[in-house]
């Protein structure tokens, strides 16, 4: 009986929490249907223990199952008091978001705020309040939504223009949006508003000033119009699109069934199961903490489009970047041609000297707004240009940004060749119509497998990824938790061009770098055809799983 208690009042749920085994906590609550707020002999609930240990995943699970945040132990400590003792920001944030009272006192009247001051954890406390969107007194922080349009006069003096820009930027994020941390900014449409406002003024200036005064550049204007409108089309396509939300289990019964099934298969762990969505994680998916959803083939969360980039909108995002980068130089050329044709010779003003040279000073003197907007648009090419190059490189390597940045964390990357063989076998054996005996897809996949993964000589050593063993988080005398990863190697561009996921032998085991890499050409064909062509055509990333049972063999399947 998991509800039996020992001499200290600990039941199975307490012990699972002590060992920071979040998946066992989830299993006991859903399969065992244990009461969540049972206290031990000292009045400590499982939520208090999880908060004290800084186990944010267990805290999240317990809160989702109705754990109370207002319970007190024998000393009058609430779960928030214990979270303050540990000082873990995520635990503090989750408990505050659950409605914990920051003014609740213990037997001596000491509140969590008093304790945080004594422990000198004010900085973490402020960040946790910001995460929970609370003010310093624990009240919900209000953000004004009044629309305000202010037209500032444009001065020639560049320092004043820069100061104006900084004032507007800082004023918006500090007083209008009332953000405290960079993460707060990512949860607002501020960055995408910067782009959209720039796009609006670019279109307005082109229609109002440039089009009529540069009519001799007919094809340049046509090219700009096509590029501008197409870029906006794909931009809003990426913004408004479903990036690839995976299906979450909505009912309690379906959630319970999913937990039990994963536990029976030995796969109830954070790598294969999302405790936020209470659903199995498809291969290459990730739970976005900003959107609070799991995204199939997750690439990254992009604040510039206020959306995630995933299976459904990745192509639209890259097409937008390409069109944007090709349209901005055309717009700048039209702007400077307009200024060159119409601006008179610069007339120096003794009281207001200009140090930019006669040409630029003349442009600013004639039309400061258009000149500034042209330079601002060129400046805006920096981040999309770098991002576009990185994205193209990753497409050529068949990696997502998430995989490239967290390579050592993914079980299907850096694994042995058997992972690649299972993936190819799932693609060539499941669908009899597409992958029957002798079908070109099957032959192509097998040939690519042989070309990309059979070399084992030390001469082929290019990249090594090795992950050290992780020790589980313990309680009491148990050892702590730490990770380690090592990376060495080179020749990434050569790998990209020839498409070989070369390996090196470590401790007698061959290591494959990326099971999805079939070479530059095949990777690009698969990406730009939206998975309808190439060796991995027909893959449904919403139900494509690679799961490795504890002590068993990995399996892959396509549905």
UniProtKB/Swiss-Prot annotation:
Catalyzed reaction equations: L-cysteinyl-[protein] + hexadecanoyl-CoA = S-hexadecanoyl-L-cysteinyl-[protein] + CoA
GO cellular component annotations of the record: early endosome membrane; Golgi membrane
Alphabetical UniProt keywords: Acyltransferase, ANK repeat, Endosome, Golgi apparatus, Lipoprotein, Membrane, Palmitate, Repeat, Transferase, Transmembrane, Transmembrane helix
Group of enzyme by EC: transferase
ANK repeat positions: 8-38, 42-71, 75-104
Subcellular location, record wording: Early endosome membrane; Golgi apparatus membrane
Membrane-protein topology: Multi-pass membrane protein
Segments forming domain DHHC: 272-322
UniProt xrefs under InterPro entries: Ankyrin_rpt, Ankyrin_rpt-contain_sf, Palmitoyltrfase_DHHC
Protein's UniProt keywords contain Heme: no
Listed EC numbers: 2.3.1.225
Pfam families in alphabetical order: Ank_2, DHHC
Residues the record marks as active site: 302 (s-palmitoyl cysteine intermediate)
Transmembrane segments: 148-168, 192-212, 217-237, 316-336, 373-393
Domain of life of the source: Eukaryota
Principal location: membrane
Any one Gene Ontology molecular-function term assigned to this protein's record: protein-cysteine S-palmitoyltransferase activity
Notes concerning its domains: The DHHC domain is required for palmitoyltransferase activity.
Family affiliation: Belongs to the DHHC palmitoyltransferase family. AKR/ZDHHC17 subfamily.
PANTHER family xrefs: ANK_REP_REGION DOMAIN-CONTAINING PROTEIN-RELATED, PALMITOYLTRANSFERASE HIP14
Role description: Palmitoyltransferase specific for casein kinase 1.
Protein's UniProt name: Palmitoyltransferase AKR1
Species in which this protein is naturally found: Mortierella alpina (Oleaginous fungus)
